[in-house]
């Protein structure tokens, strides 16, 4: 079986007989065929089923919430909707057509399905990757260049970018339906079976294609995401440093705001004069109000710091998971393109199956990272499905759809958020 082919892997979990040879593609037996352990198919079925169900459920919920909730149709959420569609497409067109032929040792779905699945598989991976890049650039503009980015951070612009992403992906992946075909082979029990293979006319084209995919779907997107999220983290870290210095300065100014240790003004700008006793209650009331305002400012600052630290941690998780999910499969693709014999010998069977499973995991974790970790989305989910318990009272701060420009996590994180002090409590 070779349904996932060169985009997710140009290698087969089925080992053809030694005598079978094709022009421009070498198929061979392993030197020492590895016996299939009885527990491996069961583990494969269990893991594939788990990832499949989580991916379908998660992405379907994301699509449902974002479509049914008009107030959540923000710029960022439009990109998240496109990401959910592409991830759902990746799950539906890849996992069943990889697992079933792998278990049966035969691609039973026919030539038309072979061409269709490889095409939609390639398109879904491409769209998903481009969406992740678009989200990172959109967040960079919102946080690091808020004034300049307001010109192009509109829903209409987001829709144009998404349309261009899908059209570009469908165009790039046109070689798949053209060069994907069924390749017959004889199994060890002398029965004839088929593999779905993506075979370009010659080795140079095959290697060039793998290198091209490695660049546009892994290396370049990975670098762009690292740079964008790195700059965002630096911006937020500077905000954390600024707020820490403001807090330290406020503490240092506090002792100088007293007069003979009797009276203290809340803003520390002047010394309060002694007044007649009849106004003592008014001064005490003013001091109490100032204390409450100070507590609000302190809580606001602490909440801001915690929110920014959470964002930085989430951005690190995004980059790590992207490389963790996709590096093994793209490395295997490149290895097989330039050293087919060695790659087949070491990766055939269970190793490549679990490498593929790791790449499919991205379609399951993306909804969790980008949506379910966002309080606005969780509130939108509760509003879309009223049968679920509401996490807070009606009309509470942070209503559905009120997404701030700072990021998908709910923190107010614009470039100049640390250039002035505010007594308002930040959104969560």
From Swiss-Prot:
Residues 248-272, 394-428 are annotated as: Disordered. GO terms for biological process: axonogenesis; cellular response to hormone stimulus; cholecystokinin signaling pathway; forebrain development; G protein-coupled receptor signaling pathway; neuron migration; phospholipase C-activating G protein-coupled receptor signaling pathway; regulation of hormone secretion. The chain crosses the membrane at residues 42-67, 78-104, 116-137, 158-178, 211-234, 314-334, 350-373. Disulfide bonds join 18-29, 114-196. Residues 1-41, 105-115, 179-210, 335-349 are extracellular. It comes from the Eukaryota. It is found in: Cell membrane. Residues 411-422 have a biased composition (Polar residues). InterPro entries: Cholcskin_rcpt (IPR009126), Cholcy_rcpt_A (IPR000596), CholecystokininA_recpt_N (IPR015276), CholecystokininA_recpt_N_sf (IPR036472), GPCR_Rhodpsn (IPR000276), GPCR_Rhodpsn_7TM (IPR017452). Coiled coil: none annotated. Glycans are attached at residues 10, 24, 190. It is a multi-pass membrane protein. Residues 68-77, 138-157, 235-313, 374-428 are cytoplasmic. GO terms for molecular function: cholecystokinin receptor activity; peptide hormone binding. Gene3D superfamilies: Cholecystokinin A receptor, N-terminal domain (4.10.670.10), Rhodopsin 7-helix transmembrane proteins (1.20.1070.10). A lipid is attached at residue 387 (S-palmitoyl cysteine). Its main location: membrane. Keywords: Cell membrane, Disulfide bond, G-protein coupled receptor, Glycoprotein, Lipoprotein, Membrane, Palmitate, Receptor, Transducer, Transmembrane, Transmembrane helix. One of its GO terms (cellular component) is membrane. The keyword Protein biosynthesis does not apply. Belongs to the G-protein coupled receptor 1 family. Receptor for cholecystokinin. Mediates pancreatic growth and enzyme secretion, smooth muscle contraction of the gall bladder and stomach. Has a 1000-fold higher affinity for CCK rather than for gastrin. It modulates feeding and dopamine-induced behavior in the central and peripheral nervous system. This receptor mediates its action by association with G proteins that activate a phosphatidylinositol-calcium second messenger system. This is Cholecystokinin receptor type A. It comes from Homo sapiens (Human). The lineage of its organism: Eukaryota, Metazoa, Chordata, Craniata, Vertebrata. The gene is CCKAR.
